[in-house]
Amino acid sequence: NSSGTAYTTLATILQIFGEDKGWDYMKKLHANINTYTKSGSAPIKATGRGENLIGICFQHDGVKQTKKGLPVVTVSPAEGTGYEVGSMSIIAGARNMKEAKKFYDWALSPAIQTMVFTSGKSLQVPSNTKAKADPDAPDLSTINLIDYNFKVYGDKSTRASLLSKWDNDVSVIPR
């Protein structure tokens, strides 16, 4: 319940297969999971150390392990995959609105995003399409991205409901 990566995986599977088939798939997948982690990048790190055969993760985390020299190959499901969108917001009525807007514009500028995303430390894709990504970052044009429903699956009550169903119907199944 603590990993956003795990929730994105669950939401993706439910969107691809539909609720009934998606939950059936999750129950079958559960039997093959070695460890559930609290960190979204932990499964692929364990895979790199040889503790798991497969690690479900965001692509940039897999590529990062490969760049470290670990025996990890990153692939995307042919059925499609969900994704994350890094974002930032300004709180309505902020005391320092002018400065907040300045920082916002600065952080999202092509120059700053190019600097951050080509430093070799982050293999995520910049949110500003005019910024350059690290050459090793995943090429989203080669990946079958689903039409992820952020409105539905980003809703707090939907998330709580799905995680409750996971706790009650999937996590209790013996492995």
Where are these regions (language model features)?
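Extracytoplasmic ligand-binding site segments that recognize negatively charged/polar headgroups
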Residues: N1-E51
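Solvent-exposed loop/turn segments at secondary-structure junctions
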Residues: S2-T5, H60-V63, E79-G82, R95, ...
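Periplasmic-binding protein-like
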Residues: T8, Y25-H30, K68-A92
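Sec-exported extracytoplasmic/periplasmic mature domains
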Residues: L14-E19, A31-N34, G48, N52, ...
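Short, hydrophobic alpha-helical packing/hinge segments within bilobed ligand-binding/sensory domains
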Residues: P43-I44, G62, A100, Q113
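A ligand-binding cleft/hinge motif common to bilobed small-molecule-binding domains
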Residues: L53-P71
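Mature extracytoplasmic/periplasmic domains
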Residues: G82, G86, I91-D147
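Conserved C-terminal helix/tail region of periplasmic/extracytoplasmic solute-binding proteins
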Residues: D147-R175
